[in-house]
Amino acid sequence: MSTPTYMDYSATTPVDERVAQKMMQYLTTDGNFGNPASNSHYYGWKADEAVKKARHQVADLVGADSKEIVWTSGATESDNLAIKGIAHFYHKKGNHIITLKTEHKAVLDTCRQLERENYEATYLDPMPNGLLDLNVLKKAIREDTILVSIMHVNNEIGVIQDIEAIGNLCRENKIFFHVDAAQSAGKVTIDLSKLPVDLMSFSAHKIYGPKGMGALYVRRKPRVRIEAQMHGGGHERGMRSGTLATHQIVGMGEAFAIAQAEMKEENSKIRQLRDRLLAGFVNMEEVVINGDMKNRIPGNLNISFNYVEGESLMMAVNDIAVSSGSACTSSSLEPSYVLRALGLSDELAHSSIRFTIGRYTTEAQVDKAINLVRTKVDKLRDLSPLWDMFKDGIDISKVEWTAH
């Protein structure tokens, strides 16, 4: 069996060869395996140097000060640390949090946990294009609101939120603003020296770095305080205890440095491939593009193929590695909660495919995906009585089904 073509770059990315080479220098006796906290000898000093360099590399990509970067095990931990950290530290100021229904589960489930601790959370509806209406956010703000958490780029539909406008609204109301940037770092320009953002979560494995590695930006001016969620040796200025994984950190730093050097050129190439993919589907009947196409990262295309059953479609196109939702929730047979929040029917949400292309995608792979999906969708529709009814001009939404 040949290996399927990988088109699921929003789920994870392969580690860049250059990143892997750097990481290997910090694992064995051939390189430097020291503990960065061992400040009494050469091995610790060299490891600490590597960690400091990586901290600068991550900070440089996003316009931050290196002292504002806190290492974590990934964006999920960063989201937890930011949201719980603010809620617990500033609980006397208020207990209300605002987020969006289309956020990643790492944000939604963290807010739900805080609700069990007697905090209150408001989950806003997005507009049908996936973007947040600022007026909806304005109306949700209360005197006891302490935090707004809105992701920069959605992991399923790839839309880019206007975090500058959202942040300005938060500043006007003296509310902390957290942004999950796992899907935007290296794809969208981020300058935290100018953006009104207090906390921002990052992931290494979404940007051709290693899994199990992330960071949280915590603003210093004006100073943002968070309560630690993990206790121990007081690492990361007391915000996140635990021995630093030097090789992972070096990998994340290198991945961010490569992204900074190559982002403009890479985005141009990926956008051309995405547009080629889109052009292959636009003339098909009953195809719906999910999410705003203007405010969107280059590599994402989320399409619903009406009158095709979701699981059948995913099985039919198993020669390409794609997803029908977030990788974190795709084991569920429920339709995507993100697409349902946009107002899509269960049927359309079920029949969606998320194509995400990246650094190693080729034109030949895009053409293969177009041909495969078109062929399989046509075949599945030929087997569908609903498709026959649609072709006969019957409005299926008005059909009254009876049980036997």
Curated annotation (Swiss-Prot):
Pathway(s) where this gene product acts: Cofactor biosynthesis; iron-sulfur cluster biosynthesis
Record field: transmembrane: none
Family: Belongs to the class-V pyridoxal-phosphate-dependent aminotransferase family. NifS/IscS subfamily.
Subunit comment: Homodimer. Forms a heterotetramer with IscU, interacts with other sulfur acceptors.
Catalysed conversion reaction: (sulfur carrier)-H + L-cysteine = (sulfur carrier)-SH + L-alanine
Native species: Ruthia magnifica subsp. Calyptogena magnifica
UniProt keyword terms in alphabetical order: 2Fe-2S, Cytoplasm, Iron, Iron-sulfur, Metal-binding, Pyridoxal phosphate, Transferase
Source species taxonomy: Bacteria, Pseudomonadati, Pseudomonadota, Gammaproteobacteria, Candidatus Pseudothioglobaceae
EC number: 2.8.1.7
Subcellular location(s) of the protein: Cytoplasm
Name this polypeptide is given: Cysteine desulfurase IscS
Role, per record: Master enzyme that delivers sulfur to a number of partners involved in Fe-S cluster assembly, tRNA modification or cofactor biosynthesis. Catalyzes the removal of elemental sulfur atoms from cysteine to produce alanine. Functions as a sulfur delivery protein for Fe-S cluster synthesis onto IscU, an Fe-S scaffold assembly protein, as well as other S acceptor proteins.
Any one Gene Ontology BP term: [2Fe-2S] cluster assembly
Cofactor(s) the protein needs: pyridoxal 5'-phosphate
Sites where the protein binds pyridoxal 5'-phosphate: A75, T76, N155, Q183, S203, A204, H205, T243
Cross-referenced PROSITE patterns: AA_TRANSFER_CLASS_5
InterPro entries with a match to the protein in the record: Aminotrans_V_dom (IPR000192), Aminotrans_V_PyrdxlP_BS (IPR020578), Cys_deSase_IscS (IPR010240), Cysteine_dSase (IPR016454), PyrdxlP-dep_Trfase (IPR015424), PyrdxlP-dep_Trfase_major (IPR015421), PyrdxlP-dep_Trfase_small (IPR015422)
Binding sites annotated in the UniProt record for [2Fe-2S] cluster: C328
Enzyme superclass (EC): transferase
GO molecular function, one term: pyridoxal phosphate binding
GO CC entries: L-cysteine desulfurase complex
Active site, renumbered: C328 (cysteine persulfide intermediate)
Residues with PTM N6-(pyridoxal phosphate)lysine: K206
